[in-house]
Regions:
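ATP-dependent adenylation/nucleotidyltransferase module used to activate substrates
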Residues: 1-134, 192-196, 215-223, 230, ...
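Active-site glycine- and acidic-residue-rich loops that bind
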Residues: 120-126, 155-167
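Short, structured loop/turn "capping" segments at alpha-beta junctions
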Residues: 125-130, 137-146, 179-181
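Internal, active-site/partner-interface "lid" segment
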Residues: 142-162
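Short amphipathic alpha-helix segments
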Residues: 160-183
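Short edge beta-strands and adjacent turn/loop segments
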Residues: 179-191, 224-231
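Long, compositionally biased low-complexity repeat segments characteristic
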Residues: 186-204
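A short interface-forming secondary-structure element
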Residues: 227-244
C-alpha cells in the first residue's frame, strides 16, 4: 500500500520516475505479481533487479539485526541501478506510522540517505489507505505484509527450502480464504540425531567421526534433513474458518511440517 501510493503520487505529479523491484527469495510470488500489476495499471516503468540475498552470511545466519543487512543490500542494488539509469533521488514507502527509532531496517535507510517522503510529510498508514482507495488503487486494503524471513526465529539459519515451505503453506491457507495471517516456522531436533549407533573405536582414535566422514570443523550449515514445526497466527474473526477447515489444513501442512499448531495469542488485524 505504501510504495504503491508513493508511485501513484509521483506519476500523478508528472515526475520522471521508475519503480525498482528487488527480487529475492524473501518475497512470495504474489508480491511480484502485485508489483507488476500496479506498474502496468499506472503506466509506470518498472525494472526488476534479481538479488541472491542468501549469498550473504549476515543474512542467512539470521542474526537479530538481519533486517539491517538485508535492507542495506537491497538498497545498494537500487541505488546503483538508479544511478546507472540517470536518477539522483531514491525514495521508499516508509510512512509516519512506522517506528522511526533505531530499527535495523530504518538504520540502513538513514545510512544510505534513502528519502522517505510519506513519513516526512506525516502521512500515516490509515491516511494512505484512504488516499489509495480514493485513487482507485487495488492495494488500498491490502493487509500489511512482512518478508518470508520474518517467519523464522532469529538465530535460526535460513535456507531456500524453509522459505519455499512457508510460501507454500501460506499459499494453501490463502486458497482456503484466509488473509492477514502468518505461518511461523520453528526448527525441531533431527529425529535421527540421537539414533543409536555402534561407534568404531579405530575411527574415533584416528580422529574420524564414527559416521566415516572427515570432520571439517565447519559448523553445520543447516541445509540437510531439517525438521520443522508450523505455528499459525490468524486474527480472531478467522477462527470459524480455521475450525471449518481444521482437518484439511492439518492434512496439507503435515506434508511439509512435522508439527502444526495454532498460536493462541491471536494476531491483531494489520489494517
Amino acid at each position: 500500500t505504501d510504495s504503491a501510493y508513493r508511485l501513484y503520487a509521483a506519476k500523478a505529479c508528472g515526475c520522471d520516475v521508475r519503480a525498482y523491484y528487488v527480487e529475492t527469495s524473501f518475497q512470495p510470488e504474489f508480491e511480484r505479481e502485485d508489483a507488476r500489476r500496479l506498474a502496468k495499471e499506472l503506466g509506470a516503468d518498472m525494472k526488476t533487479l534479481p538479488l541472491n540475498i542468501l549469498a550473504l552470511d549476515s543474512v542467512r545466519n539470521n542474526p537479530k539485526d538481519r533486517c539491517y543487512y538485508c535492507k542495506n543490500a537491497i538498497f545498494h542494488e537500487i541505488l546503483k541501478a538508479a544511478a546507472d539509469d540517470g536518477f539522483s533521488c531514491v525514495m521508499d514507502g516508509t510512512n509516519a506510522s512506522d517506528d522511526a527509532g533505531d530499527r535495523p531496517g530504518m538504520r540502513a535507510l538513514r545510512e544510505l540517505k534513502v528519502f522517505s517522503p510519506l513519513r516526512l510529510c506525516g502521512i500515516t498508514k490509515k491516511a494512505l489507505r484512504e488516499y489509495s482507495r480514493n485513487a482507485g488503487l487495488f492495494t488500498w486494503d491490502k493487509p500489511a505484509y512482512a518478508c518470508l524471513a520474518t517467519r523464522v526465529p532469529s538465530g535460526t539459519f535460513i535456507d531456500e527450502e524453509i522459505l519455499a515451505r512457508i510460501e507454500w503453506a501460506e499459499g494453501q491457507l490463502a486458497n482456503l480464504g484466509f488473509s492477514d495471517f502468518r505461518v511461523r516456522a520453528a526448527e525441531l531436533p533431527d529425529p535421527d540425531a540421537n539414533a543409536s549407533r555402534t561407534p568404531d573405536p579405530d575411527a574415533s582414535a584416528s580422529g574420524i567421526p564414527a559416521s566415516g566422514a572427515p570432520d571439517s570443523g565447519v559448523p553445520h550449515s543447516g541445509t540437510s534433513k531439517r525438521n520443522w514445526a508450523a505455528r499459525l497466527q490468524i486474527t480472531k474473526d478467522q477462527l470459524p474458518l480455521l475450525l471449518e477447515h481444521q482437518s484439511q489444513i492439518l492434512e496439507l501442512l503435515k506434508t511439509r511440517f512435522s508439527q502444526v499448531s495454532l498460536d493462541l495469542e491471536l494476531r491483531a488485524p494489520s489494517r
